[in-house]
Structure formats: C-alpha cells, structure tokens
C-alpha cells in the first residue's frame, strides 16, 4: 500500500543503494532514482562511472522508477578534489568521503530532491535515523551491522538533512541486503563493494596530486627530535602519520612518521611509542542536535573510519572547537582526519583534527 510519500533514491550502481529502493518500495514509498555525475574526461573514478550509471539506470527502470543524472562535476572538483589537494599540500591527510557527503549527496542532491517535490532523499548508507519524540530532535545512529557501519562519514549532517533522510539499509546486515537484492532480481546483487577513494582508484595519491593538482613534490629531510638528518624524503604529500614502510631510511630500528612540518619541509621520525597521544583538538565542529553542550561530556570517540571507538571526555571550547581527552592514548592521530563522537549507538557529532 502506498503511503503517499515521494523519495528520491541516490543510486551509485552498487547493491546497497539499489536495495534501498527495493526496501522503500516494499514499505509503500513512491521512489525514483538519481545519480550524480562527478567526473569530467580528465579524471577516472570508481564511483558513479559510466558502468555504474548503466547498472543504476537498469535497476531503476526494472523497478518501474524514473532515473535522473545530475551533473555536479564542477562542485565535486571544487569542494572535494580541490580541497583534497589543498589539504595534502598543507601537510594534512583529508577524508574526501566526508566532504562528498556534506557537499554533494546531502547538499546538492538533497536540494534537488526537495526542489523537485520529493519528501525524502534516501541513500544506501549503513546507518539509521530516528526521531526522538521527547525532544523533537532527529538522531543519527550506527547501522545495525557494526562491520559495515558508516555513521563515521555522516557526522556532519544536521537536523534539516536528517528530517528529509531515509536510510533503510541501516536496519539490516550485508548478507540480508544481498539476499533482498537477489530476490528482487537486481543485476548488481553480487556486485563487489567499492574500495579506496573513488577518484584515486589505484590508490596512488602522489600521482593524482601531481597530475590533477599540479603539485610539485619537493624533496626534504627526514629528521629525529635532536635535529639529526636521517635521510631524504620525496615530498611531504607522499607520507602520512604512522607510516613505517617505504621511508627508505636505515636507522638501525623501525622508525615511523610522527609529524610533517610544512614550514621547513621536514618530516619528523621516531619510535612507535611516540605515536601515542591522549589529547587532540578539532575545528569545523558539527553537533548533530544543533546545540553545543554547555559542559564536558563523556563519550566514545574514534579518529579513523575503521577504528574502534575509545572512551574519552570532550570539552567544548569557547571558539567553537573541541578538545578530546582519551582515557587511553591513541595511536597516530592524524591532522585532517575526523574525530567522531558517540553516546552509545548515537552519533553526537565531530570535527576535523588539527
């Protein structure tokens, strides 16, 4: 039975977003599909490619849905790829998936959905949205399948976006989603999951920075805390905090990247133990509730997508930033990555590590 609500489903050509359309139609929603065109001829990508678009269109038509393709190449280049280049050049390690979600999926695409008269945007993310009746606030929760949970990359969502967002896949585990897709006869039911950064499909960030961003790799010194030169590096963007392999340094022991210094183009190396720290600060903070806590909060937090959260206290600072103090030191906290805060299953928000 139809419930009268119209949904625009963001389809990537993968099984999760396609299954989202199947699940929503079963729940009585009137669904159409849409994909964002993110690349021009200069960049090859593994997400939203021509093959992906063909798969998504085939699924949409097979389900009796309309299918739109919206050109967002300029916005993707400006807000995601150009920022990726700028962050690496500033000595940080960004997470472009978070920028894409904020600016494209839940920015440009949600705007288009609402302008076209849809009530909701839906995606295939493994996370959940719930309305808290007592407060009237929408809450972002982890996906039920903890091994696939994608709530980390959604921490920048706000109340307006959550009010118009459906995440049906988040209620299921991956095997159930594939089973639903097979039962619906979807051509991509067994399609493999995408990996890595979509616009760097081969994982060669250095080559991307050089060819797309025009970045020149300037060699410099590897140094220790005493200022001794341990060797030469190939350019700051070639390395990330915590890296051990590929340094080309003979120090008589394992050494790791501790910090990249943009000012003098050096990279500080040291022992693994020196990578652990208990405190970080973050800016560009988002609180999903829209309200900054008035006092410190006990939370769990993680600083990488694949990491398990750790107990911490978050201190809101007067300038809008946060200071996060972990109970147990964390390894390789990296500038440019996101720290995301949880209260049990609920995502409270997060920020960009300084």
Task: State where each predicted segment sits.
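AMP-forming adenylation/ATP pyrophosphatase catalytic core
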Residues: 40-41, 122-354
């Amino acid at each position: 039975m139809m419930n009268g609500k119209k949904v625009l489903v963001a389809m990537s050509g993968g099984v999760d977003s396609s299954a989202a359309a199947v699940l929503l139609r079963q729940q009585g929603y009137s669904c159409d599909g849409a994909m964002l065109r993110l690349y021009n001829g200069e960049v090859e990508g593994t997400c939203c490619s021509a093959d992906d678009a063909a798969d998504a269109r085939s699924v949409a038509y097979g389900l009796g849905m309309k299918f739109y393709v919206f050109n967002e190449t300029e916005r993707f280049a400006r807000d995601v790829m150009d920022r990726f280049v700028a962050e690496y050049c500033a000595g940080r390690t960004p997470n472009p998936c978070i920028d894409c979600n904020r600016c494209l999926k839940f920015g440009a695409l949600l705007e288009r959905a609402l302008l076209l008269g849809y009530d909701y945007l839906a995606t295939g993310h493994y996370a959940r949205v719930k309305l808290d009746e007592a407060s009237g606030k929408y809450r972002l929760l982890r996906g039920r399948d903890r091994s696939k949970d994608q709530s980390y990359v959604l921490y920048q969502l706000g109340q307006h976006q959550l009010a118009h967002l459906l995440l049906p896949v988040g209620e299921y585990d991956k095997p159930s989603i594939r089973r639903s897709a097979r039962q619906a006869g979807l051509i991509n039911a067994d399609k493999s999951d995408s990996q890595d950064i979509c616009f760097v499909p081969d994982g060669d960030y250095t080559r991307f920075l050089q060819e797309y961003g025009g970045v020149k790799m300037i060699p410099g010194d590897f140094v220790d805390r005493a200022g001794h030169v341990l060797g030469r590096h190939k350019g700051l963007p070639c390395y990330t905090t915590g890296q051990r392999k590929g340094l080309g340094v003979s120090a008589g022991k394992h050494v790791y990247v501790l910090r990249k210094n943009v000012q003098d183009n050096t990279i500080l190396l040291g022992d693994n133990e020196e990578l652990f720290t208990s405190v970080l600060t973050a800016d560009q903070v988002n609180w999903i509730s829209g309200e900054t806590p008035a006092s410190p909060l006990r939370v769990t937090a993680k600083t990488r997508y694949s990491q398990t959260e750790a107990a911490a206290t978050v201190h809101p600072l007067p300038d809008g930033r946060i200071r996060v103090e972990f109970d147990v030191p964390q390894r390789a906290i990296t500038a440019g990555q996101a720290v995301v805060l949880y209260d049990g299953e609920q995502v409270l928000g997060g920020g960009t590590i300084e």
